[in-house]
Every structure is written in C-alpha cells, then in structure tokens.
A protein has these predicted regions:
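Hydrophobic alpha-helical transmembrane segments of polytopic membrane proteins
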Residues: 207-217
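Short, hydrophobic transmembrane alpha-helix segments
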Residues: 32-46
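Polar-ligand-bearing catalytic/cofactor-coordination segments
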Residues: 1-26, 42, 49-51, 58-202, ...
C-alpha cells in the first residue's frame, strides 16, 4: 500500500493494514447480518431500518472521509500557512519531500502549546501536515530534531496508513449508527408493530446492544494494534530517510517531556487527535493496562528500535549522559 517514494517499504505494515481492513469488513458484515437476523426473528421492520441507517451512515462516512483533513485541522484549531509565513517549516518539508521523491503536503500550524504534530488527509494529493506552536517554539528542538519529526509524519503519508486509519474509524461510526436506528425504532415503534410480542422487543434491544459492544471491542483492539505498529514503522522509515535516528530519539524525548508539563485539562482536549499525533497527549505513568489500550508504543520501545537502527547504520550508540 505504500506510495512510490524513497521511504523504506514496510511489508509488516502493509500486511497489518490489509488484515485490519479485511477483518473490520468481516466484523461489520457479520454485525449487519446479526441485526437483520434479530429483527427478522422479532418481526421488526429490519429492512427499512438497515436501509435508512446505511444511507445516513454511509453519507456521514463519506463526508467525514472527504473532509477528513479539514475536520482534523478544525479540531486542532489549526490553519494552513504559506512559505512566507513559515519559511523554515516549508524549507525543511521541501528538502524532505525532494529526498523522498514525494508530493509535498499542505502545511498547517496549530496555536496550542502542546508540542506535537500529525498528518491527515484522504489521500496523498489531499494530505496536510500540521505542527503545533508548542513543537516549533517551545520544545527546544534543533533543526535536525524537527526534521526527524517531520520525516516521521511524512512517512505516514507515504505509507498511506493515515487513510487506512480513517477508513477503519468510519466503519465503527457506521456500525454505531446502525445500533442507534435499531434501538430507537424498537423503542418508539416496536411495541405497536408487534402487538402482544413486547417481550421480543424487550429482548431485541439488549441483544443488539451486546452485539454493538462486541463490534466496538474488536474494532478498538484491531485499530489500536495497527496504530502502535504504524508509529514504529514511521519511526524506522523517518530515521532511515534522514539517516539520523539519534535526532529522532532526542525529539521523542523532548516532546514527551514537554507533554508531561502540559496541564491535564489541556491534554484531555487534545484526546480526539491522539491516534494521529507524533507522540500521545497523555502523561507517562507506566501502567500496563493503559499501555495495552494505548495508541502508541511506549517511549522506551520506540527509542530501543531507533538505537538498533543506529547500530545498523554503523553509528555510535546512545549517549549514556542522555540528550546530546
């Protein structure tokens, strides 16, 4: 699924993206079949409900996909910036895109002090790379470290994993709408249609809710597994493109430290974009359960991989004194 660029291909990522979409598709089809079967058994008007839900769900999914870049920028309070407004940022991205032989995405800046970055868009032609003012002006990144962050984000565009994450999330949205239509249909109309079969309606809604919970849990875990791997793939590809894994190590460390200094309330407001961020907008606590459901691999795991890449490139290992 990777675009034709000089970013190192990642077969593991391609396999995982394909498997995730296939499994999510199967889960979605099975869920629709479950709703139809349950409502048919209860003599409810399943066909009309499914049709209406698919129309509304498909429409909202299409709008969300088509305007995914604008929606993400609005959520971040970001605006696009021209080369005149952000010459250094554009200069670094120009060099990286030339090095990777890929189309340059639009660039945007978010006014938040949270140090972070993300890439989004329905395809490479409509991609946008957004960085925060916190990353540009308050994280103390060197130019090489900022270049490492941007190379990581451009890798997501080149590998097309941003698109897969968007598609996967939309399937969950449509499934949720199916449940709502089924629920409200039976809540407000089921008893009148079924006469003395109200006990069937009472049983139908909990079963649909249970099916919904199972679908959500499976979708959640599949998306989280893909999300964590794609971050490792972007770290690796970005480090290999720049040939400077140590700069990315330093950037990860500085950004994570900067996030830990952000008030918890501000971090919560950034949660909707967590899956797309360079580093998760959460405070590091080392809790095992939190790591299982995390959108990103642990900082230690990411740094360990980059240290191994340093050795592969024949570069010195990590500085025992910490950041250089």
């Amino acid at each position: 699924m990777a675009a034709r660029t000089r970013y190192a291909p990642d077969r593991g990522l391609t396999v995982r993206m394909t498997a995730t979409m296939f499994l999510l598709g199967l889960v979605f089809v099975a869920f629709v079949a479950l709703i139809i079967g349950l409502m048919t058994a209860a003599h409810a008007s399943a066909g009309a409900i499914i049709l209406v839900a698919l129309i509304f769900g498909g429409g909202s999914a299409f709008v969300s996909l088509f305007y995914s870049d604008k929606i993400a920028l609005a959520a971040a309070g970001a605006r696009e910036v021209s080369p005149r407004e952000a010459p250094e940022l554009h200069g670094i991205v120009d060099r990286l895109c030339a090095l990777a032989d890929m189309d340059k995405p639009r660039l945007a800046v978010s006014p938040t002090r949270l140090p972070n970055a993300f890439a989004t868009g329905r395809n490479s032609k409509h991609a946008v790379l957004c960085v925060t003012e916190g990353l540009l002006y308050h994280s103390n990144l060197t130019q090489e470290e900022l270049e490492g962050v941007l190379a990581h984000e451009l890798s997501h565009v080149a590998h097309k994993d941003v698109q897969v994450m968007t598609y996967a999330s939309l399937l969950a949205i449509v499934a949720g709408l199916l449940v709502r239509f089924a629920f409200y249909s039976e809540l407000f109309g089921g008893g009148r249609r079924m006469g003395n079969n109200n006990s069937q309606a009472a049983l139908l809604i909990p079963l649909i809710m249970l099916g919904s919970a199972v679908v959500y849990a499976i979708s959640f875990l599949l998306i989280r597994l893909l999300s964590r791997y794609r971050e490792l793939a972007a770290d690796r590809s970005g480090a290999l493109l720049t040939q400077n894994p140590s700069a990315l190590i330093n950037a990860l460390t500085k950004v994570s430290q900067g996030i830990n200094r952000i008030p918890t309330q501000d971090l919560r407001s950034a949660e909707p974009l967590n899956a797309f961020f360079f580093a998760p907008a959460v405070k590091l606590n080392g809790k095992t359960l939190a790591n299982i459901f995390a959108t990103h691999p642990s900082l230690e795991k990411r740094i360990d991989q980059l240290n191994k890449i340093q050795l592969e490139l024949g570069q010195p290992g990590p500085d025992p004194r910490g950041l250089r």
